[in-house]
């Protein structure tokens, strides 16, 4: 194994240990081939199945990339006229005064300025477009928007138009316990639990997938919607999702986003992507440890999976996320041989 590959895997194992995760997986694709694959640990912090190819991790908020593709379809098919349409043009069930001036672009780039109290009431944190803040409310609103536009859940569109053509068997919004599912650890001293939701409508944080299928999801984007020579998703849909859609902020530290994806323009203090990662790369992350990095310049897809809630580093977590992407990008900059390594 190339020393740089081993160095990256050692780093993944170190963070797994430091953050009290019981599981880790790495899949790297370059030039449409799996060149590195690694699995370690077990499905929970008690007696559990060993992690392997068929282990399905909860990817938490990395599910945004799936919702993003569905909204890309809605734009492509003219269900939405423009990203700059006010969300109130479509959804009338929200306080129009609070939502005033809030566009679909704002919701898709975390610049909407909305937040939610414990009692479910919505308030404005800052004027739409003036800043950036990661809040979960936009995911719910966009999920509702898709159902309003199509009269069915976005998960159905993905199953029919994307998952079936790709041959996905292990990507699902899980509603029942299964031995294939990796449990999530909230606290090291407590038993890990299944992260389920009663429905597969996309509203819950119950999307599970294997490291391989997550990598293939990234590779579909890398190849602009093509899979094995077939155009599965229109190229324009992918381009909408993975090119910068956020507006310029007065605060230069704030990250750039496509449709939810972090997109590398130049190094930003509050971005999850490291400064050494080439321009045009994009990344999605979940708070249970899944990370998907796509580097078009190197025709590279990197997947890293954990099963511990909250990424390592506490308030300094962005440093470790950037460090991983820097290390991964550096390790695979030189075109790699097609031989696959598995530990």
Model feature map: region roles:
Residues 174, 179-183, 191-231, 241:
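Active-site-proximal binding-pocket segments
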Residues 51-54, 123-128, 138-140, 195-203:
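Flexible glycine/proline-enriched surface loops and loop-helix/loop-strand junctions
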Residues 281-343:
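Structured C-terminal helix/loop/strand segments within mature extracytoplasmic catalytic/sensor domains
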Residues 12, 26, 32, 55-83, ...:
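Active-site SXXK
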Residues 7, 53, 58-61, 76-115, ...:
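Active-site helix/loop module of the DD-peptidase/beta-lactamase fold
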Residues 141-145, 205-227, 290-306:
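Active-site-proximal alpha-helical segments within enzyme catalytic domains
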Residues 2-57:
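Short, conserved catalytic-motif segment at the N-terminal edge
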Residues 182-205, 243-301:
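Active-site Gly/Thr loop motif
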């Amino acid at each position: 194994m190339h020393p740089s590959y081993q160095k990256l895997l050692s780093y993944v194992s170190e963070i797994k240990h430091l953050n009290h995760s019981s599981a880790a997986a790495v899949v790297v694709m370059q030039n449409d081939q799996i060149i590195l694959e690694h699995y370690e640990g077990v499905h929970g912090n008690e007696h559990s199945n060993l992690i392997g190819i068929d282990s399905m991790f909860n990817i938490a908020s990395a599910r945004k990339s799936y919702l993003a593709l569905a909204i890309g379809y809605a734009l492509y098919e003219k269900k939405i006229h423009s990203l700059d349409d006010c969300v109130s043009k479509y959804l009338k069930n929200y306080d129009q005064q609070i939502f005033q001036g809030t566009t679909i672009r704002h919701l898709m780039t975390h610049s909407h300025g909305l937040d939610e109290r414990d009692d479910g009431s919505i308030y404005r944190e800052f004027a739409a477009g003036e800043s950036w803040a990661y809040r979960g409310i936009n995911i719910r609103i966009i999920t509702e928007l898709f159902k309003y536009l199509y009269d069915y859940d976005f998960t159905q569109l993905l199953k029919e138009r994307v998952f079936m053509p790709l041959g996905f068997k292990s990507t699902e919004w899980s509603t029942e316990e299964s031995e294939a599912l990796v449990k999530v650890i909230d606290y090291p001293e407590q038993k890990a639990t299944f992260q389920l939701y009663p429905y597969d409508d996309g509203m819950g944080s119950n999307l599970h997938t294997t490291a391989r299928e997550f990598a293939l999801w990234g590779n579909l984007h890398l190849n602009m919607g093509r899979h094995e020579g077939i155009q599965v998703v229109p190229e324009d849909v992918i381009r909408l999702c993975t090119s910068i859609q956020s507006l310029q902020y007065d605060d230069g530290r704030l990250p750039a986003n496509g449709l939810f994806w972090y997109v590398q323009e130049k190094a930003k203090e509050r971005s999850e992507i490291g400064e050494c990662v080439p321009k045009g790369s994009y990344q999605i992350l979940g708070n249970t440890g899944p990370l998907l990095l796509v580097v078009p310049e190197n025709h590279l897809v990197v997947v890293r999976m954990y099963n511990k809630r909250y990424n390592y580093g506490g308030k300094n977590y962005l440093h470790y996320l950037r460090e991983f992407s820097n290390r991964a990008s550096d390790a695979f900059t030189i075109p790699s041989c097609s031989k696959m390594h598995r530990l």
